[in-house]
Amino acid sequence: MADHRPPGRLMGVKNYLIDGVSGTGKTAVAEELQRRGYHVIHGDRELSYRGDPETGEPLDGLAEETVMDWPAWVHQHHIWDVDKVKSLVADQRHASSFFSGGARNFTRFIDLFDGVFILDVDLDTLNRRLAQKPEDEFGGRPAERALIARLHATKEDIPSCGVVIDANAPLAVVVDGILSKCGEAD
């Protein structure tokens, strides 16, 4: 993969982003990478907040009842802390770091990554996985599932520069495929 990072900037050895709509397996892939000893940042847990995707300004205190389409609003304002991403990418302590998750402000940091992988599944698999999510997790409610199905169909809000990975395959095969594309295969 080509190195699209800005020249002259101290970076971690190799940094990769694993993205895809909710239900495609980002968390499962990240956990398997961790199990295999790789450094993983769960971006949706460690870096995310509700904010303006253009400015990064936090949007706190907005009540659900004040927004017409709450799931779409939450999705559009799910962003990562760009300064934290930059700091983690610059960390030289790990040979490879895998960032897992999705953010609406990915255009502000995607060029920092050595590679971007987009997990994709067929609609039946997506619907089956979403049906297993608890209601307190994004994708666990019918309105959220409808939004995710639309995003799956349109591919909007997904980086277009990524390598698409068929995540219908067994987890070990998916992870082996990603590692092989990173030159990390055993």
Q: Where are each of the predicted segments found?
A:
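Walker A/P-loop
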Residues: T27
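Conserved phosphate-donor/acceptor-positioning beta-strand/loop module used by diverse small-molecule
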Residues: L112-Q132
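Conserved substrate/cofactor phosphate-moiety recognition/catalytic segment
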Residues: E31-D83
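P-loop (Walker A) phosphate-binding loop of NTP-binding proteins
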Residues: V21
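Hydrophobic anchor at the beta1->P-loop junction of P-loop NTPases
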Residues: I18
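Glycine-rich phosphate-binding loop used to anchor ATP phosphates in small-molecule kinases
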Residues: M68-F113, D120
